[in-house]
Regions:
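Conserved adenosine/adenylate-binding substructure
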Residues: 116-119, 174-228
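A mobile, often basic/glycine-rich helix-loop segment
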Residues: 226-252
């Protein structure tokens, strides 16, 4: 059911021995599994901020790729893909695209609202999270709880988040991040297993939010949905230059 690899299954296999679990630490707790680092994965993480393919930071421990399942038979592992996202270009007018996005966003939010407990929203005051609050309000959710994180910096988004909270009459909570992170590191590393750029503030914010709600929505991924950041366009343009350089070198040789 994990089409995009949100919560992958981890596994370790050697000879006729197979272990799997929802976290790598569960596998590492077995005495037959060596605790060795995967230097190649660490190199990828340091350069790309993510690890390609199904590797982890632990040697010989992998995870099942998104939209795939693992078949173990006769001491052999076979990974089979059951889901492949194939985006296609559909011609439509601006208004058609606008209405289509609005409809799909509302449907996505409605799906996530299936819960027996109150639901909160990480509210930055930006377009992504503000849209979630607006959709929840349109869907008739009265008890909306919103949460905003700040760093005691001029760039804090408390003011813009408060405007949205007032507009939709949410129960709004704010928190200033303690910039003394060392005391949090042991728990952060234990729970995450893989370093991420916003891991520390995410962990602290989740702790704060968990005192009020157990389910929370966020606007992460909005930029990627609309072709990513400016740097992606630059890299795409440079790709043609790279191809030209390689071809020139080959012709010269």
């Amino acid at each position: 059911r994990d089409h995009f690899g949100v919560k992958p299954i981890f596994y370790f296999s050697k000879d006729d021995f197979l272990l799997f679990g929802s976290e790598a630490k569960a596998i590492l707790s077995h005495p037959s599994v060596p605790r060795k680092r995967n230097n190649h994965a660490i190199h990828l993480l340091s350069n790309l901020r993510y690890v390609q393919s199904n590797q982890t930071l632990f040697k010989d421990i992998n995870h099942v790729p998104p939209g795939s399942y693992l078949l173990y038979e006769n001491e052999r592992i076979v990974i089979k893909r059951y889901f492949q996202f194939n985006p296609s270009i559909q011609k439509m007018s601006y208004n058609e695209a606008k209405e289509g996005i609005l409809e799909k966003l509302k449907k996505a939010v409605k799906t996530q609202l299936i819960s027996d407990v109150p639901i909160g929203v990480y509210l930055s005051g930006g377009m992504d999270s503000s849209s979630l609050v607006a959709m929840m309000s349109d869907l008739g959710i009265d008890d909306i709880r919103t949460f905003t994180l700040g760093f005691n910096e001029p760039t804090d988004e408390f003011e813009s988040a408060q405007i949205i909270a007032d507009q939709f009459d949410t129960e709004h909570y704010t928190m200033n991040l303690d910039l003394n992170p060392m005391k949090y590191f042991p728990n952060v590393i234990w729970h995450s297993e893989v370093p991420k750029i916003n891991l520390l503030q995410g962990y602290i914010m989740s702790n704060f939010v968990s005192k009020h709600v157990k389910v929370v929505l966020g606007g992460m991924g909005g930029d990627e949905l609309f072709a990513g950041y400016d740097i992606h366009g630059i890299l795409y343009a440079l790709q043609s230059l790279s191809d030209w350089v390689h071809k020139s070198i080959e012709n010269f040789i």
